[in-house]
Amino acid sequence: MFAPRTAPWPLVALFTAGYLPPYLLPTTVGRLDTGLPLTATQAGAVGSALLLSSATAGFLLASRMQRLGARTPARLGLALAFLGYGAASLTTAVPAVVAGAVLGGLGSGTAMTVAATRIAAERDPHRASTLGLLTVSALAGAVYLTVPHLGRAHGLPLAAIALTALAVWPLTGRLPGPEAASPAAHGTGTTSPLPGRRSGPVLAAAVLCWSLAQNSLWGVSGRIGLTQAGLGDAALGVVFAVALGAGLLGVLAAGALGPRLGRAMPVGAGTVVIAGCIALTASATTPTTFAAGEIAWNTLYPVVLSYLIGLAASLDPRGRWAVLVGSASSLGTAAGPLTGSVLSAQAGYPGMGLVLAALLLVVAAPMTAVALHTGGRPLLPGAIRRRGGTPAALVAAATGTPSGAVPEVGAPEQPVVEITVDAPAVPVRGAYDTAGPRQAAAAPGPGAG
């Protein structure tokens, strides 16, 4: 495993390769619309198929990651991503583009699942997930700034994703194989029951709707900026890059705040504010209003997302809920482009924004309730320590940090487990001899005198 004070760069890189397709969704869907004989709704459906394939990989692998290890699935996922997205970027035949996008989505979803599982098992998972969000946001911002100057070809965003997968491949050699157990699962059986059977499904369903609302707007943001707000292609790329840069600041702010606000307030209040940002962006008719809505929205989105990742990871130190909730989020993300296209076609962009904002206000309540339920009574800092002497209460208090092998801040103490000893106790005193030297052939007994 990686050294405690060393950033797990292979996981960060794998996280980046897996999460890049959703970040590039607006330009991917927009270029499919303009560069291929597809309608806006059909282009959104291709984007949804890509992300649905990614979510499917997460659901299929969620319960198998500990047995498969990280190295082999990561390499397979990166290979599929490179081949699928690469092929889709090099052809203009619509069936081949769709097939390549679906194959690439399966690969990026596999990479995302491996990264989520291993990050949840890290001693400091918040640090790893924060670095991953920072890296993918920076890379996506660079793509948004660069791609408009390279032409109008539909395959440029897809090629960027394929090349990222290729660049990450050499780092997979540092990932553990199937024989290496995760730190959080050390000492636990492979058949331990899934905890959080009430909170987990509620959180997964709410996060699915949360992601659906976010990505319904994100999938049509490019068209809103071009057709309703009056931006050019290059100016739109700058707005997206600045918005993702603001998201970097949001992630850093979340890391700095850590446990000070708990999880309930960032998740609940953050979602309410995001609802307002979505309504503002969808109704924008000027470049200034559109840019303000996009930047504010993208500043808050990764903040709330980091707390949701941590909330899911805290439900199970083996990372199973982190993967399942992440896959539910991917399902919402997958349905986003098609949902946004259909809603905007039926109700217009402002009407779509109001519907999505209302959905976010509805799901804010159950997500906040799960965060409050997971919080509970705080532990005294330093009362329990992890290996290495770090106070567990302080480690678990960090935003997005699952409890691992010790209770999380606010969680009840773990029960004491009775351990069965194979060797039975000696039943009679006659089995003992008196202290002192014994003759070699003497039988044990109570001794003379």
Where are the predicted features?
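A late C-terminal transmembrane helix in Major Facilitator Superfamily
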Residues: 19, 315-357
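Short amphipathic helix-loop junctions that connect adjacent transmembrane helices
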Residues: 26-42, 219-235, 310
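Helix-to-loop junctions at the C-terminal end of transmembrane segments
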Residues: 56-72, 120, 249-263, 344
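Structural signature of the two symmetry-related core transmembrane helices
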Residues: 72-86, 265-280, 354-357
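Cytoplasmic helix-loop-helix junction between adjacent transmembrane helices
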Residues: 94, 100-135
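Intracellular juxtamembrane helix-capping segments at the cytosolic ends
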Residues: 109-123, 302-317
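Helix-loop-helix hairpin linking two adjacent transmembrane segments in secondary transporters
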Residues: 122-126, 130-177
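C-terminal transmembrane helical hairpin of 12-TM major facilitator-type secondary transporters
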Residues: 261-308
